[in-house]
């Protein structure tokens, strides 16, 4: 009888654990019903990019900020794999150990936004993904020096 009760308890615990694991949400599952518009000025040319925003509290906070007014960010190259600039507000963080891909839009330390044109691994929050450009095109658009990015959202 004790053996049967032990088996039942084990099965219940395994079922509960599996159910709880299935309820975990990934910050990249689902997208918000709006697009992020990005205007890039690299000093020699201007480009318009569009990105999807992931459905997480960080992206929602960014969208709320941008619904008030567009935000202009001065961005600098870092490590020859990203452009990074300070946001005018701190956003909630949902950091996870990830490896970025070209086109990823990442929240760093809650107050910096980065556009990746190469890979990097660290604890980051994914905000979204730039659409419709290759890695080579993105690298050319972002250029080798500083850029100015104007962020806005559309519904």
Question: Which residues does each PLM region occupy?
Answer:
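Bacterial N-terminal signal peptides
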Residues: 7-16
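N-terminal secretory signal peptides
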Residues: 33-81
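Extracytoplasmic
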Residues: 31-35, 46-48, 57, 101, ...
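Sterically constrained small-residue positions within well-ordered secondary structures
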Residues: 11, 27-29, 106, 140
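Sec-dependent signal peptide cleavage junction
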Residues: 17-29
């Amino acid at each position: 009888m004790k053996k049967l009760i032990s088996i039942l308890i084990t099965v219940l615990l395994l079922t509960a654990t599996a159910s709880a694991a299935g309820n975990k949400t990934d910050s990249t599952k689902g997208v918000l019903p709006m697009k992020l518009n990005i205007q890039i000025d690299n000093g020699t040319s201007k480009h318009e990019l569009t990105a999807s925003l992931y459905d997480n509290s960080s992206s929602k906070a960014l969208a709320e900020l941008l619904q008030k007014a567009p935000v202009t960010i001065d961005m600098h190259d870092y490590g020859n794999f990203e452009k990074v600039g300070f946001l005018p507000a701190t956003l909630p963080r949902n950091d996870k150990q990830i490896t970025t891909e070209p086109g990823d839009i990442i929240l760093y330390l809650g107050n910096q936004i980065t556009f990746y044109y190469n890979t990097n691994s660290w604890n980051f929050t994914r905000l979204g993904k730039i659409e419709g450009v290759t890695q080579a095109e993105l690298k050319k658009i972002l250029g080798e020096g500083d850029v100015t990015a104007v962020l806005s959202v559309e519904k």
